[in-house]
Amino acid sequence: MRDDQNFIGKEQVKRMDIFESMKKRRPVKKFKRVPIPEEKLNSVLGSMRLAPSAANSQPWKFIIVRDDQMKQRLASACQGQRFIADAPVLVVGCATIAEAYPYLGMYMSSYPMDMGLALSLGELAACQEGLAPYWVYQFHNEKIQELLSIPTGDVNVVFILALGYAEEDGEPDGRKNLSEIVRYEKYS
């Protein structure tokens, strides 16, 4: 994989319907044991790489895990989400805190937001590629760091993205109506 490779080419942009990908994204907890072609994985990773970040800091590193034994170990550190071990690929999203913009909103580091943007684009690209993404957000950071030899202190595990083909369709998430979440001119 080349650094300068354009993962989202003109032909893909023409066929991409972002709204369709948003609608078809579902939490899937059962994966087929079918390998993911390298081109599809690179499309997902390339989309994550293109995510915006505060001051273009790009504080992310993505660890790709395919080894079945390692996936089992990681799943055991994910608080009851053992099904992720059945996904052909786990993408472990790590943030290097020192590389993130330090004062988002003048009170916090940008890395949680930066990583969330990368995760969102990765999920949408996965849907576009016919893959089922599952965002793992409950895990023991220290155990994951130990298993994957991630440096402690300045690097945090922010998410694990399980990728595969859905064995069965996930249930749609309930969504609040716009009237419940949108305010005009002021909060109240």
Language-model segments: which ranges?
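Short active-site-adjacent structural elements
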Residues: 100-101, 143-145, 168-172
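C-terminal helix-cap and adjacent tail motif
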Residues: 2-14, 18-37, 159-188
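Small-aliphatic-rich amphipathic alpha-helix that forms the alpha element of a beta-alpha
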Residues: 48-49, 91, 106-148
